[in-house]
């Protein structure tokens, strides 16, 4: 393969431009045995063994994935996320012990993404067959995320599960003076009782 072609392939990855891609390729060329060979083998193995979970659409080496298969997880709570990276953010924080449902995006009229383009189908089935009590909608706090949240709430309406949405507002360590009006409004309406 041509070196320039490899640089261009790396540049297609998120957050990597031509300069960063060039540095990565040069590093790989200088460290063929200790970096390039294991990296290539790892990518090949990942491509061969990664599966999409038939339940939640997570990616893992097994299906159902290790999260859906974990008997220690609370199967009565489903956290609906837009993307796989969102699931991994929750897992990294070790702040959630339920199961997930990865949509693969958000509804977007501007981008032409409708319900048929997302992994929405299994949510209601999971609620009915697994005794789900709560669906946490953890979509982005933008217009597309809010539309997606509303759509999911309508889907779930005829079931016994309650639908909750992540609170939004002041970030941890954030100063009120630096917040925009929308964030401050969201924080004010999401307030909770302390005493």
UniProtKB/Swiss-Prot annotation:
Domain Toprim as annotated: residue spans: 76-171
Keyword flag Protein biosynthesis: no
Zinc fingers classed as C4-type: ranges: 53-68
Alphabetic keyword roster: DNA damage, DNA recombination, DNA repair, Metal-binding, Zinc, Zinc-finger
A Pfam short name: RecR_C
Alphabetized SMART domains for the sequence: TOPRIM (SM00493)
Single Gene Ontology BP annotation: DNA repair
GO molecular function: DNA binding; zinc ion binding
Function noted in UniProt: May play a role in DNA repair. It seems to be involved in an RecBC-independent recombinational process of DNA repair. It may act with RecF and RecO.
Family affiliation: Belongs to the RecR family.
Protein name: Recombination protein RecR
């Amino acid at each position: 393969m041509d070196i320039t072609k490899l640089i261009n392939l790396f540049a297609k990855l998120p957050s990597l431009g031509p300069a960063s891609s060039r540095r990565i390729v040069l590093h790989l060329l200088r460290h063929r045995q200790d970096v390039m060979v294991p990296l290539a083998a790892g990518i090949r193995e990942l491509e061969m063994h990664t599966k999409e979970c038939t339940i939640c659409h997570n990616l893992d080496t097994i299906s159902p994935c290790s999260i859906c298969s974990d008997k220690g997880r609370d199967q009565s709570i489903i956290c609906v996320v837009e993307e796989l990276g969102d699931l991994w953010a929750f897992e990294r924080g070790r702040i959630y012990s339920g199961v997930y449902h990865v949509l693969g995006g958000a509804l977007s009229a501007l981008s032409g993404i409708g319900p048929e383009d997302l992994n929405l189908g299994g949510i209601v089935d999971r609620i009915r067959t697994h005794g789900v009590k709560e669906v946490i909608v953890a979509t982005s706090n933008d217009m597309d995320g809010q539309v997606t949240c509303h759509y999911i709430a309508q889907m779930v309406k005829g079931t016994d599960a309650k639908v909750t949405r992540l609170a939004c507002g002041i970030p941890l360590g954030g100063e009120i003076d630096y917040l925009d009006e929308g964030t401050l409004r969201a924080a004010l309406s999401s307030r909770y009782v302390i005493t």
